[in-house]
C-alpha cells in the first residue's frame, strides 16, 4: 500500500527535473546566439582561421626570381641538351636577341620575353648542325656504305632512271594534315626505257601532254588517292600499263602508210633512194652502207628531216642548201 502511494510522487519529481534541465539548455543556447550576433563576421573568421592553422597559418616570404638561364650558359655548352627535341620558343633558354612582331610608333619589334609571335611559329632550334651530326653518328652503325660505282649523277640516272618526288609540310595551324602532301610525281627519261621505234612513238602518243619533247622526260602526277603510298602505287601502275600497251600492235597499225606517220622518217624514203642513186652514178659502184656512213650523207639526212618536221624556215633552207653543196661537191 505504501509502495503504491510513493510511485506517483517519484514520477512527478522526475518531470520537474526534466523541465529544469531543458530550460537551462535553452538559456545557454540563446546566450551563444547573442554572443555570436554581437561579434563581427571578420573577427569570427579570423579567430577560426587562427585556431585551425596556428603556427602553420603564417605566410612564407615570396622567393625572388633568379637570373635567366641565358646569363648562366657557357659559351661551349652542349646545345643538344638545351633543345633535345622540337619545342616552343623559350626566351629564357635562347641566348639570342631575337625580336618579332609589329613595331609600335616606328620603333623596333617587341623583344623575346613575353612575345607570343615567337611562341606561335614553329622553330628549328632542335635541328642545328651539331644535332644533325650527332644523329648521323648514331645512325652510322645501321647504314651501309654508298656504292663506289655510283660516283656521279649520270651513273645514278643510268642505273636508277625513275625519280619519285613528294613534299612534306610543316604547319602551325589546327591540323597537321596538308592535302598537297599526298601528291606524288614520277619522272623517267623516255630514252632509258627499253622500247623500239614503234613502242616509243606509241607511248608518246598515249602519254600526250605528260611527255616533254625538249627534255625527253615522261612525267606522271597522281593525286586521286587520299594517301601518299596509294598515289605512289597508282603512278607505278600507270607507268607499267603505258609500257606494256606501247608494245602491243593493233591490226589497224599495220595499214598505216608513210603519209600517216607522225614524224618524217628518212630511212627507206624516196629522198634516201634518190640520193643513193645519184651518188652511185657520180662516184661509181659503192656499197649502200658505205655511202650512208659518210658524214656528208648524214648531214643531208639531218637537214631533210629537220625541214620536213619543223617546216621550211629560212634557217632550215640554208642548212639544206649547204648540205646539198657538200654532198655534190659544188
From Swiss-Prot:
The entry's keywords: Mitochondrion, Ribonucleoprotein, Ribosomal protein, Transit peptide
GO MF assignments: structural constituent of ribosome
InterPro entries referenced in this protein's UniProt entry, alphabetically: Ribosomal_mS35_mit (IPR019349), Ribosomal_mS35_mt (IPR039848)
A Pfam entry, by short name: MRP-S28
Intracellular or extracellular location(s): Mitochondrion
Coiled-coil region list: none
TM segment ranges: none
Keyword Transit peptide included in the entry's annotation: yes
Domain of life: Eukaryota
Compositionally biased residues, Basic and acidic residues: 64-73
Subunit structure of this chain's protein: Component of the mitochondrial ribosome small subunit (28S) which comprises a 12S rRNA and about 30 distinct proteins.
Stated name of the protein: Small ribosomal subunit protein mS35
Gene: mrps35
